[in-house]
Amino acid sequence: MDKRENTASHVLARFRGFIQAAATLVTNIHLPNFAKGGIYQGAGKTVCVPGLNCYSCPAASGACPIGSFQSVVGSSKFNFSYYVTGTLILIGVLLGRFVCGFLCPFGWLQELLHKIPGKKFSTKRLKALTYIKYFVLLFAVVLLPVLVVNDLGMGDPFFCKYVCPQGVLEGAIPLAIANAGIRSALGQLFTWKLAVLIAVVVLSVLFYRPFCKWICPLGAFYALMNKVSLLGIRVDACKCVSCGKCSKVCQMDVDVVRAPNHAECIRCGKCIGACPVDAISYRYGLDVSAEKLPLTADKK
């Protein structure tokens, strides 16, 4: 493993929090719009941001890829969203779930909530719940907007309308605070979405990134690309001493030695910092050498 590569990996992992904050700010750069009660509608809204960030957020500088995809597949013309799908595939191939670990505002929020002092619970025995997000992607994002339509042939953006807590947090709540007309129009749907948001907030305090692990369709899409993405995690078999510290520190419940580029790995780099022999690093490119060992990390 190249020494410069290892050093760069440690630096990237160490400054992840700053990168998350910067990514959130860039994704929501139009902060004065919170006071104005309006949303930015400029040219930037024709570009999809990589993470989950509501189009209706007053500060949003770009479009949410999930919302953009649903607005097209649910239209009466039923045009397949080549642009959005192509953008997602490109990001997935280049970065995989690095987006979740470094660039997603809602992922960062869940991490901050989990830092609130109190009893925490492991999700290792709840791994079956990670498959829910794939059903959300297939049904709530793709199939239902196409199959369930009104008399005009228009489908609802089911995930954005009925599930996504980010839409309430970034869009509905700040817009309702600033606009009396919007406040007066709030009804049962807002109450339901607010309940979803509260549930996610509470769960995020107790569990590490529950929405990312179990519900997020964007995370599900990037997870499908994780093993083929150019940015990944490398474990040097010659250096690894099978101490198991990497897997113990992983809050995404990944067996780092056995499957360093598992679908649930968000490239957070905690395993890199935990390794006592510097056997783990980020890698970029098609090189998959020294990527896994035959034994799990907790065996010697």
What is each stretch, according to the model?
Residues M1-V257, A263-K300:
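Non-ligating segments of multi-cofactor redox enzymes
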